[in-house]
Amino acid sequence: MTQDEMKKAAGWAALKYVEKDSIVGVGTGSTVNHFIDALATMKADIEGAVSSSEASTQKMKALGIPVYDLNSVDKLSVYVDGADEINGHMDMIKGGGAALTREKIVAAVAEKFVCIVDNTKQVDILGEFPLPVEVIPMARSYVARELVKLGGDPVYREGVVTDNGNVILDVYNLKIINPKELEEKINAIVGVVTNGLFAKRGADVLLVGTPEGVKTFTA
């Protein structure tokens, strides 16, 4: 089974967490694109979706899935999204696709977070994948200096502007022993919008595509 086939298996497996007549929170990325394809097969049974990125919004609209503004929605029963890394405690690094802020907002609203990945994303300790940090443009150099003080090696992601009009610093060489603590420390730096650690709001369910099929883990 190829990596993409494992992603597809995880994406389709997430359908069972979608409630009838509900509004579904939808993330961003290659694995989520498979989930969106799956969701389109039951679009008549759901009210619609809330999206974490312009890219996912466009894909869902093209498939005929109604997309709602989060401000018009009282609750989301489930949010389905991928991860760049996830550990055994359901803490994640996300934001490789630069949609981390909106992803974090939608995840905060949802009652259940279902994370869909292939088996290459499971790690013991977070940090081998560089940690994305969304930053107000004028604060980029200041924030980079503060991240160095935390032991990281920040690199400006050239040519990338987030859906919110901000920039991304990718922080290398962090061995993240306490994800919740580091998430709070980085978010406390003036000029940081948010960072890609999802530890305060981790996943509730993890669906992992493997060569043997989809494995399910719960928090």
UniProtKB/Swiss-Prot annotation:
Keyword Cell division: no
EC number(s) reported in the record: 5.3.1.6
GO biological process: D-ribose metabolic process; pentose-phosphate shunt, non-oxidative branch
UniProt cross-references to InterPro entries, sorted A to Z: NagB/RpiA_transferase-like (IPR037171), Ribose5P_isomerase_typA_subgr (IPR020672), Ribose5P_isomerase_type_A (IPR004788)
Protein family membership: Belongs to the ribose 5-phosphate isomerase family.
Job description of the protein: Catalyzes the reversible conversion of ribose-5-phosphate to ribulose 5-phosphate.
Classification via NCBIfam families: PRK00702.1, rpiA
Protein name as it appears in the record: Ribose-5-phosphate isomerase A
Organism phylogeny: Bacteria, Pseudomonadati, Pseudomonadota, Gammaproteobacteria, Alteromonadales
Gene name for this UniProt entry: rpiA
